[in-house]
A protein has these predicted regions:
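The feature represents the first ordered module of a protein
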Residues: 40-95
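Beta-strand-connecting loop/turn residues
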Residues: 26, 64, 112-113
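Short, surface-exposed, low-complexity cationic segments
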Residues: 121-146
Length: 164
């Protein structure tokens, strides 16, 4: 399990960016506008997710156990939705920045393709006694719940372009 601050994700090769965190009812929204990057970030399929003029919008619902990250290109077209399964979300006491407790499992939505990623990481953490059986089971239950709510959960189906 890893504590993830919203301000830290997907900015490794980014030289200049603007970031805005706002509260929208019972969720925090983090908008990252990529101004200048040393090199574009692409996934193994070749899909570029981080480049100059792109946006990353993260919605962190405080009453749910996930974080939804949406990648948009320079035309504000949605490239991918990436859902991190978490054991809980909150506000970091030291930095006052929203965070989620990442529990390895991710759900990735590209066009009409949906798949669960990093099951192997969850299995490895369980086998190496890095997480308990209870945590392992909870992560799988949360993941299955998210999968069943993909078309109805207000945070997942939200058109994030309204935050840009």
């Amino acid at each position: 399990m890893r504590k993830r601050l919203l301000t830290k994700k997907y900015l490794r090769d980014v030289k200049e960016y603007m970031i805005k965190i706002t509260k929208d009812n019972d969720a925090y929204v983090c908008v990252k506008e990529i101004i200048d990057t040393e090199k574009p970030f692409s996934i193994s399929t070749g899909l570029c997710l981080v480049n100059n003029g792109y946006h990353i919008v993260e919605i962190l619902p405080m009453n749910e156990k996930f974080c939804v990250r949406t990648f948009l290109n320079e035309k504000n077209e949605i490239l991918q939705k990436y859902i991190d399964v978490s054991l809980g979300n909150g506000i970091d006491e030291e930095t006052n920045i929203p965070y989620y407790d990442d529990i390895f499992l991710d759900i990735i939505i590209n066009d009409d393709e949906i798949y669960v990623d990093d099951k192997d990481e969850l299995e490895k953490a369980y086998k190496n006694n890095e997480i308990t059986e209870e945590t392992y089971n909870e992560a799988n239950i949360i993941c299955n719940q998210i999968l069943s709510e993909l078309n109805t959960n207000k945070y997942i189906i939200k058109d994030v372009r309204e935050y840009l």
